[in-house]
Amino acid sequence: MNIKTRFAPSPTGSIHIGNIRTALYSWLFARKQGGKFLLRIEDSDLQRSIDDTVELIVAGMRWLSLDWDEGPYFQTNRFSRYNSIISYMIQHDMAYKCYCSSERLESLRSNQIKNGEKPKYDGYCRFKSTDIYSSSISSYVVRFCNPQDGVVIFHDQIRGTITFNNKELDDLIIRRADGSPTYNFCVVIDDMDMQITHIIRGEEHINNTPRQINILKALRAPIPTYAHVSMILDNNLKKLSKRCGTLGIMQYRNDGFLPEAILNYLVRLGWSHGDQEIFSIEEMIKYFDLSRISKSPSILNLEKLLWLNHYYINHLPIDYVASHLSWHMHQQKINIQNGPKLTDIIKLFARRSRTLKEIVNNCLYFYIDFDLFDNKVAKDYLKPVAITPLKFLRKKFSNIVDWTPEIIKSIIIETVNEFNTSIDKIGMPLRVALTGTNCSPTLSITIHAIGQSRVLERIDQAIRYIST
């Protein structure tokens, strides 16, 4: 069998990590089996589709390096195909036109609920000649002739055997009154035409599965293998919302997460391989198995994701991390030519940072000069008593020929001894003068990275601030 999976998001909002986990599982399964992975945009619902969302979906997949072998396909480009199949089904008594008014359907629903029955269409137009309507009513939908007896049985790769009674299913609308085909129909024709062998998707689609299988059987098409993944819950144990902007996958990029951390976190969010926590992409492909996906819901844990991101910031090749950091610096409009190499910045901040955004926010003083000391830190440390030590340090720094962290450190220690004081009394005013903050990496290394000329200028600036 030639394995083929698909990721088929609807462009009705930002794709969140639940969607991406489904894409990852489908991608991993295809890659492990030597099959193909397809990207399809299910945009048949014209009223709910958002144009910009498609770009976000593609950008998110590319950022995560979840490459596809076919696509992206768009359902809106396939309407003629859907309509030709619907016409065929009507001609062969697999589907029929339904002229029932909204008033009749609402009355039917109300009565069924009142009588304690499950609301569903009663097949009224299925058993009536449409000739009596065609001349007086132009608006109609098309419904699929669902089997009225028997059961639908399928083996879910995660949940085992699932059975539905056909009596519980009504005749599904496959084309709306406006002429547009419905989701449950389009997805069946797409999977049939694109020869999808394995459908990995969220558990919210379980109830769609028997309807889709019945359509496939009517068309005498192969039935794919299904695997329905449990939902992801937020910290309040509520289902993730697709329209919650903070959960959009690209928001995680904006917040400073590496794609490797996202993928590692998501693969473990419902799947396991022993006690192993850290997985390379190659290991994910090697070990991935649908049977090891849990049936239970997973809970989003930001602290775990931050822990993984910290791990990857510190363990991935430094040039690779620097390439991602460069993107964040560009987003902040920071000229990276105006300061140390990004690899040096990573060496300084990686151990203490859980996101790339933290690194950016903490390293600004290496690239952007500041001219105001109006914060509490400056008032606490840049006092008249600091002027003389700062002048002493400035003179020593200006005479350095070989600008190295070791020589800088020796001058700081010399200054401490010269003024017979503590390292904090010298180091903190110097740190604030050079960085504008009371928190930085090791002072001598920080000073070295800032650069000699900039250090001298900032000490002069601090002395002027204290003197005014």
UniProtKB/Swiss-Prot annotation:
Coiled-coil annotated spans: none
Keyword RNA-binding listed: no
Domain of life: Bacteria
Enzyme class: ligase
Compartment(s) of residence: Cytoplasm
Predominant localisation class: cytoplasm
Example GO molecular function: zinc ion binding
Entry-linked InterPro entries: aa-tRNA-synth_I_cd-bd, aa-tRNA-synth_I_codon-bd_sub2, aa-tRNA-synth_I_CS, aa_tRNA-synth_I_cd-bd_sf, Glu-tRNA-ligase_bac/mito, Glu/Gln-tRNA-synth, Glu/Gln-tRNA-synth_Ib_cat-dom, GluQ/Sye
EC number, as in UniProt: 6.1.1.17
Annotated ATP binding sites: 242
Keywords annotated in UniProt: Aminoacyl-tRNA synthetase, ATP-binding, Cytoplasm, Ligase, Nucleotide-binding, Protein biosynthesis
Annotated motif 'HIGH' region, positions: 9-19
Pfam families: Anticodon_2 (PF19269), tRNA-synt_1c (PF00749)
Keyword Endoplasmic reticulum applies: no
GO biological process: glutamyl-tRNA aminoacylation
Role played: Catalyzes the attachment of glutamate to tRNA(Glu) in a two-step reaction: glutamate is first activated by ATP to form Glu-AMP and then transferred to the acceptor end of tRNA(Glu).
Family: Belongs to the class-I aminoacyl-tRNA synthetase family. Glutamate--tRNA ligase type 1 subfamily.
Name of protein: Glutamate--tRNA ligase
Lineage of the organism: Bacteria, Pseudomonadati, Pseudomonadota, Gammaproteobacteria, Enterobacterales
